[in-house]
Regions:
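A structural boundary/capping signal
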Residues: 1-208
Length: 208
């Protein structure tokens, strides 16, 4: 069975706060899937291949937090995907400190990033992403969010070292209970993001 090296586990042990885990996630190059093959890599594969996209970074972040007493949670942010208006979903790692929620996030953009633990509940945390969640032409697209998915309770104890893609996690995030953020009437009245916001949304951390 494949396992983490001792020095890797020691490095994880040093990441004692969510902020330090986020710094570590930011240091990992972004996975652009340049060979055209979709992946959902395990934390072990992320380290071996030294890249991660959104859900891969989230799974790694959840695993590292679990080593420090946090449950390994994922939260699915679901975007509009009907008709001509289509956007990407996002996955973050909710964590709770002193009764308040924050989130880890692996993204290549200046938006949809780490959230400090200052939010009273999951919905409040989710809504902090709402105004940053828009297409290149400024249409706001965040529509639903899931209940937190506990990887430790839902999957066997090898998910973090799997050599196979973790499509089961991706599929479970789609299946679990979701909550609508707003009504159709409210959606119809949404204002476009400002030009300067759209320009900021084009800033990237890693180049292809």
């Amino acid at each position: 069975m494949f396992e983490f090296f001792k020095d890797e586990l020691l490095e994880f042990k040093k990441l004692k706060t969510p902020a330090l885990v986020q710094d570590f996630l930011n240091s990992i190059p972004f996975n652009f899937e340049i060979d055209g093959v979709d992946t959902v890599k395990s934390p072990l594969r992320v380290l071996r291949e030294n890249n991660a996209h959104c859900i891969e970074g989230a799974i790694l972040g959840a695993y590292i937090l679990s080593l420090h007493g946090h449950p390994p949670l994922l939260l699915h942010l679901e975007a509009h995907k009907k008709g001509k208006l289509r956007d990407w979903d996002h996955v973050v790692v909710p964590f709770k400190i002193d009764g308040l929620w924050g989130a880890l996030s692996k993204t290549n953009h200046a938006v949809l990033r780490y959230r400090e633990p200052v939010y009273r509940d999951i919905r409040e945390l989710v809504m902090s992403y709402f105004h940053e969640y828009f297409t290149d032409d400024g249409k706001k697209t965040l529509r639903r969010y899931s209940v937190p998915l506990n990887l430790g309770k839902t999957f066997d104890d090898t998910w973090h070292i799997s050599q196979a893609d973790l499509w089961g996690i991706d599929e479970e995030l789609d299946k679990i209970k979701h909550f609508d953020i707003m009504s159709k009437q409210s959606i119809a009245k949404l204002r476009l993001a400002d030009k300067i916001e759209r320009e900021a949304g084009q800033i990237v951390e890693w180049k292809k």
